[in-house]
């Protein structure tokens, strides 16, 4: 049923993302500071990832507090009024998703496909790997 699907999405994606995004944001900032002089694009990567972190956090909170209750009402009532109440929220969430996709594309470009500038440096390798994993997880 619909409630089970929503609970599955929250467990499978949202809980992990809400745990991981702030930690990864800290690591991205550390990487940016470490390579500030040699790799100036890492400053932009840090800025873009902070945008993703902020947008995803708000996105998830909005879905849980506003969209899911409206969605369940729509499934229960299947009425035009429930659909109209839900529609602007869905439009906004789709716009947020487009922003996130755009920011990840920029990060991918700035990092040459998430290629570490120093493959012998664990922080660099870790951050690039986690950025790519997050892009994959968010895009699916």
Specify the residue positions occupied by each region the protein language model found.
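Small-residue-biased structural context
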Residues: 1-139
């Amino acid at each position: 049923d619909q409630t089970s699907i929503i609970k599955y999405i929250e467990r499978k994606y949202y809980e992990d993302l809400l745990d991981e995004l702030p930690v990864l944001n800290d690591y991205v900032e550390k990487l940016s500071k470490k390579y500030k002089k040699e790799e100036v694009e890492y400053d932009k990567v840090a800025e873009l990832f902070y945008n993703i972190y902020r947008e995803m956090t708000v996105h998830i909170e909005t879905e849980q507090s506003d969209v899911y209750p409206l969605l369940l009402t729509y499934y229960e009532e299947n009425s035009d009024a429930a659909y109209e109440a839900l529609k602007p929220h869905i439009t906004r969430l789709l716009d947020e998703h487009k922003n996130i996709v755009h920011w990840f594309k920029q990060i991918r470009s700035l990092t040459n496909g998430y290629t570490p500038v120093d493959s012998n440096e664990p922080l660099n390798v870790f951050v690039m790997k986690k950025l790519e994993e997050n892009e994959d997880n968010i895009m699916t």
